[in-house]
Regions:
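Membrane-helix entry/capping segments
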Residues: 3-6, 11, 15, 19, ...
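Generic structural signal for small/hydrophobic residues in well-ordered secondary structure
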Residues: 13, 23, 44, 60, ...
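Small-residue-rich transmembrane alpha-helices
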Residues: 32, 36, 258, 334-402, ...
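Membrane-proximal extracellular/periplasmic loop immediately following the first transmembrane helix
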Residues: 37-101, 115, 144, 214-230, ...
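Intracellular coupling helices
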Residues: 6-14, 18, 22, 26, ...
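In a subset of proteins, long, contiguous C-terminal domains/tails are tracked
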Residues: 616, 627-630, 641-654, 659-662, ...
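Mid-to-C-terminal secondary-structure elements
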Residues: 118-135, 149-275, 474, 478-672
């Protein structure tokens, strides 16, 4: 019997090949798209969730009270405090980049990414040791000049033939400190934030922080820090206790301490991620909507096919078939199509995995992805069977009880609303994606045409390494296509503020007012050479520099932008004084502030991505190391100059050192809009897929519907109806469905688009024509899809139709 069901199922698959093809391909696309999105979300939110204590492990970060800036980590002395003074804490671990230039057996190792950790690190994040000391991979030593080191398999195989050969090797840094490899551990998984080449242990307890006052150590730069709480700890109470710990105990009056689950660390503290978590969630929800669109299409086509087979079911019933037999046949046919859709989905994944990894900047384990696809397929199969069987159960009941009237009665009373609802849902999802894609396109186009406020053309950004700074600035002058080297200091184009301060003072500043002010510390001629427009006063000049200034600042003249001038609330800010505290140069509270004279006001310019409003900004001279250099090139010589700069950096960078990151400013701007561009591609693709699935589905349904209604149309023509009236009647039906779908989907799309646009200070305004354009586009799309079928049916010969029946 089962064999007969399968044979009949494949026969019907071929008989209704167009509908079957649309069902299988559409379902395969929906299943694959949603599965990839779900896998991506699960992968990105499971970082380091595989460690035994991950459920109770939290990352510690701090917020500077002065600047409001979030900093990953905390002063290292907090780790000792947590281990000794907080009973809620099971383990507290800290780690930090070690730096260093290493050699081993006269072999240059270069600057691997080593991190020093405290003794709790391997308890909290136990590594998989593959060679060496299994029980204590990095024993702590009292002598800081001689430490033990555990390295990854990748690092060991880079310099030695086997992990075992690396054991016992001694690495010596530039200070003649040595590190002995005592263990080789397995490479960290790709979904882990711990990606160092090696780790060595140091002691971190309060006895190591007694030579100076606690306040001194609490002003140290932050280190990475993680805490594992006991199982029954009240996390909220612990968080409140930790939040103001340093302030209440007068250890650091400018430091708030916060915690976040380790699985959220990557996105909560990673401001420069290619994709934020909201985008990934949007991807998943969009994939789910596409899946529902394909499921609605599948259900519509399946139910329509079953009604087309009403005579077959009536004949089966008359020959003794019972409900069970009919249900089994339908279940087998749906199962065959879902299985074929899964096979197509597997093929799509195999073909597109490299492209998906590159596009989404992620790593894909195919075996896990295939399991997710199978689970999604089972979910879809269950949902399809439940809905289809529920819909047709009454139809089969009618066939059993009313041999003559059953099929036609059910068709006229139930099939129509099923068809209309299903088509409407598909069109609604399609309309939502089309509207969103339109808004995204307009917003991105506006962003690309927004002036940054400085000349971004023919400009190269270099994140310069300190090892090559002097030689680079000397030799860059010899490249003929480069006309100028601009000291950028801390200025860089990014999503996040790189340096902001709140404790900036000026005359008549409102009491208790707090403003986050961006500080640009760069070369004396930075604003002039970046071609930032001067509105009042003058630029900074060489004569403003004071080489003998005791604070080390070197210049007490500054420029401000329009936003900062508005805060000063004065008609002429030129000559006004502002004050600021600089804890790096002037110490802690109680030290007199630094005073600066405003000599010029420049036009507002974007130093951050266009997701951010232009902040009040102060430009001051920076007398220290430049993190960024900007190279101005001859017009049209940008690519040639970029190639020459990269060759220079490659030539002068010592062996083993990372190369300085170099790119054009316009390329950097493209990176900053990567999420927006990816969102546009996503919703455009979804709109196209939904439109195609809907078009094929509507075409198939309309073809079947016209075939079923040919007798009705013939009778109407005999009774005097013209072909034009029949065409208008049929098109009116589909137009009403389309209007209803737009009436529901467009307000939902508006709410989503408006919420998305709120993150941009300069955004497009949603106008009436945007709604009208989508409405007209969908009406035109539907009419063109069904018009051919309707015209053929309306122009048919009614006499032949009546005779054939």
């Amino acid at each position: 019997m089962i064999r007969h069901y399968f044979k009949t199922g494949f026969r019907n698959l071929l008989k209704y090949k167009t509908q079957s093809f649309i069902c299988i391909i559409g379902l395969a696309i929906g299943l694959t798209f949603f599965t990839v999105g779900y896998y991506w979300y699960r992968y990105e939110t499971s970082y380091d969730s595989f460690y035994p204590e991950s459920e109770h492990t939290y990352n510690i970060y701090t917020i500077d009270k002065q600047t409001g800036k979030m900093q990953p980590g905390a002063p290292v002395i907090l780790c000792a405090e947590l281990n000794e003074n907080f009973p809620e804490v099971k383990y507290a671990a800290t780690l930090s980049n070690a730096g260093g230039i290493y050699t081993s057996d006269n072999k240059t190792i270069g600057t691997p990414l080593f991190k020093w950790v405290n003794q709790n690190y391997t308890r909290l994040f136990p590594p998989k040791v593959i060679a060496g000391n299994m029980t204590d991979p990095i024993p702590t030593t009292e002598d800081g000049t001689k430490t033990n080191l555990m390295v990854t398999r990748k690092f060991a195989l880079k310099y030695w033939k086997t992990p075992e050969e690396a054991i016992g090797k001694i690495l010596t840094d530039q200070n003649k400190f040595t590190k002995t490899i005592t263990a080789v551990i397995e490479n960290p998984p790709s979904n882990s934030i711990f990606q160092a080449d090696g780790y060595y242990s140091i002691q971190v307890d309060k006895s190591h922080y007694t030579s100076r006052s606690p306040e001194y150590y609490w002003n140290y730069p932050p280190n990475e820090m993680y805490v594992c709480l006991h199982e029954n700890t009240d996390v909220k109470a612990f968080s409140r206790k930790l939040h103001t710990y340093s302030i209440k105990n007068q250890l650091n009056p400018n430091l708030y301490i916060e915690i976040t689950p380790i699985t959220k660390t990557r996105y909560q503290l990673g401001a420069e991620m290619s994709f934020n978590l909201n985008y990934i969630r949007t991807f998943v929800v969009s994939g789910l909507l596409l899946l529902f669109c394909t499921l609605f299409n599948f259900i519509n086509l399946q139910v329509n096919r079953i009604f087309e087979r009403s005579r077959e079911f009536k004949l089966r019933t008359s020959l003794g078939a019972v409900k069970k037999n009919l249900f089994c046949q339908i279940i087998i046919e749906i199962s065959i199509q879902v299985l074929l859709a899964l096979l197509v989905g597997v093929s799509l994944i195999e073909l597109t995995t490299p492209y998906i990894e590159q596009l989404l900047d992620t790593s894909i384990q195919k075996q896990e992805l295939f399991i997710d696809l199978l689970q999604t397929g089972i979910f879809g199969w269950t949902l399809l069977l439940s809905i289809v069987l529920l819909i047709i159960s009454r139809f089969i009941h009618k066939q059993s009880n009313d041999f003559k009237a059953g099929p036609q009665l059910f068709h006229t009373t139930n099939n129509e609303w099923i068809r209309k609802i299903s088509i409407g849902l598909q069109l609604g999802i399609c309309v939502g994606f089309m509207f969103t894609a339109q808004i995204l396109f307009l917003q991105i186009n506006r962003m690309k045409n927004t002036a940054m406020g400085f000349d971004t053309d023919n400009l190269i950004q270099v994140n310069i390494s300190s090892q090559i700074y002097s030689q680079f600035t000397d030799e860059i002058k010899q490249i003929p296509s480069i006309t100028d080297c601009i000291r950028g200091g801390n200025f860089r184009l990014s999503h996040d503020n790189w340096h902001t301060e709140k404790e900036i003072g000026w005359e008549n500043k409102p009491a208790n007012a707090s403003y986050e002010i961006q500080m640009i510390q760069a070369g004396i001629d930075f604003a002039q050479k970046m071609k930032i427009t001067l509105l009042k006063g003058r630029y900074l000049e060489d004569t403003d520099m004071q080489s003998d200034e005791p604070s080390g600042i070197g210049c007490h003249k500054v420029l401000i932008n329009e936003q900062m001038a508005n805060l000063l609330d004065t008609n002429d800010p030129i000559g006004k004084m502002i004050s600021r505290k600089d804890y790096l140069l002037r110490g802690t509270d109680g030290t007199p502030p630094l005073y600066f004279e405003i000599v010029g006001v420049v036009k507002d310019f974007h130093g951050l991505s266009l997701r951010n409003p232009i902040p009040p900004t102060i430009i001051e001279y920076w007398n220290f190391y430049d993190y960024y250099l900007y190279l101005r090139t001859l017009p049209g010589k940008e690519k040639e100059a970029l190639k020459a700069v990269k060759e220079l950096i490659s030539r002068i960078t010592p062996e083993g050192f990372p190369l300085s990151e170099t790119m054009t400013v316009n390329d950097q701007l493209e990176i900053l809009t990567r999420t927006e561009n990816a969102s546009l591609r996503l919703f455009t693709l979804l709109a196209i897929l939904c439109a195609l699935i809907s078009i094929f589905g509507i075409y198939s349904i309309s073809s079947s519907n016209m075939q079923q209604r040919k007798k009705e149309i013939a009778i109407r023509k005999v009774m005097g109806a013209t072909s034009r009236e029949i065409i208008d009647m049929s098109l009116k039906e589909y137009t009403i469905i389309t209007l209803t779908a737009n009436a529901i989907a467009l307000p939902v799309g508006y709410l989503f688009a408006q919420k998305w646009l709120e993150q941009y200070p300069q955004n497009v305004h949603i106008q009436l024509w945007m709604f009208i354009s989508i409405l007209l586009a969908t009406i035109l799309l539907v009419i063109l899809t069904v018009l051919g079928q309707v015209i053929r049916a309306a122009n048919g010969n009614p006499a032949e139709v009546v005779k054939s029946d």
